[in-house]
A protein has these predicted regions:
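Divalent metal-dependent phosphate-bond-processing catalytic cores, especially two-metal-ion Mg2+/Mn2+ enzymes
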Residues: 3-4, 8-19, 24, 65-66, ...
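Histidine- and acidic-residue-rich, metal-dependent catalytic cores
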Residues: 25-70, 75-81, 85-89
Length: 191
């Protein structure tokens, strides 16, 4: 999956080079990845077994969506969930490595975003109106981890501790991290 992501990232750079960078946020890179790999036949350069193409296509398409369609089941759902976990773990490590991605502001977090977070739900990017809410959105991604292995990795590598260390206003985000740490530990021991 990482190989596909690297290839898609390179093709994505080529694709958007002709556009204003403000367009980048409006392009769904999961859908673009599917288009680049399958519509242009690039998949043949990486993988030959056409029996797996639909699983690969769905995994790439849904790795960055807020959820996977309910009617995707069996091996196709497992492949989607593996890709989603891998993508989120990469994002968490990127947030730790590049501290400037966790930028804060002086705004309060809206009631809707707060409620969604404390109900252990993913937050839709369209509902985000501030840098602080973007941090909460990033934290809510932990709710969409699908495998015990992924939760164990989060706990063993102390990802939450490292992210909390990067936050400047620890008091503002303390309850979010405490709640999330409790949820992650529970899921790590129960899955």
């Amino acid at each position: 999956m990482e190989l596909f992501e690297e290839m898609i990232a390179e093709k994505f750079k080529e694709y958007v080079s002709d556009y204003d960078m403000s367009d980048v946020n409006s392009i769904d890179h999961g859908d673009l990845g599917v288009s680049l790999l399958f519509d242009n036949g690039e998949i043949d350069n990486f993988y030959k077994d056409e029996n797996d193409f639909n699983k690969i296509k769905l995994a790439i398409k849904y790795h960055n969506k807020i959820s996977v369609l309910e009617d995707i089941v069996g091996d196709e759902r497992v492949m989607c969930n593996i890709a989603r976990d891998a993508d989120k773990l990469d994002i968490f490590h990127l947030l730790i490595e590049n501290k400037s991605l966790f930028m804060e502001d002086d705004t309060t977090i809206s009631k809707d975003v707060r409620e969604c977070f404390f109900e252990n739900k993913m937050i839709n990017y369209k509902d985000i109106k501030s840098k602080n809410e973007k941090i909460v959105l990033s934290l809510a991604m932990f709710y969409d981890i699908n495998f015990k292995y992924s939760y164990k990795h989060i706990v063993d590598t102390k990802i939450l501790d490292d992210l909390y260390e990067d936050v400047n206003n620890k008091e503002r985000f303390k309850e979010y991290f405490e709640h999330l740490k409790k949820v992650v530990n529970e899921r790590c021991s129960s899955l």
